[in-house]
Amino acid sequence: MVKIRLRRAGRKKMPVYQIVAADARAPRDGKFLEVIGRYQPTAKPHSITIDKERVEYWLGVGAQPTTTAQSLLRATGLLYEMNLKRKGRSEEEIVSEMAQWQERQSARLQKRLAVKARRRQAKKDAQAAAAASAE
């Protein structure tokens, strides 16, 4: 059975992962069939590059993505695009659906960043209030 999974590379405390198609029996960093992408979790923001054609090929021949690889494929929108193709949508519909999906993802990211900024500000305010009351 072929799996789409992550293969660790990089140096100590600075991981870079290759997204590979590999035999399920092979070790994590061992023999693989093909490199189909790259994931850099330490980059700000995280960097994911995937060869869509090769991922579609491997999924088409029955490769199973691991949960982590599947979440990365979902984050890039590849699984959503493949699902639209499978449903028989036209190319124009797929392009418009993917544009809407990109907008939803960017809105979700902006909302998450706003929440994070509010929490950070609330924490600073609480620390300032605690310091003022301590004096």
Swiss-Prot record:
One of its GO terms (molecular function) is structural constituent of ribosome. It comes from the Bacteria. It holds the Pfam family Ribosomal_S16. InterPro entries: Ribosomal_bS16, Ribosomal_bS16_dom_sf. One of its GO terms (cellular component) is cytoplasm. Keywords: Ribonucleoprotein, Ribosomal protein. Transmembrane segments: none annotated. One of its GO terms (biological process) is translation. Belongs to the bacterial ribosomal protein bS16 family. HAMAP family: Ribosomal_bS16. PANTHER family: 30S RIBOSOMAL PROTEIN S16, SMALL RIBOSOMAL SUBUNIT PROTEIN BS16M. This is Small ribosomal subunit protein bS16. The gene is rpsP.
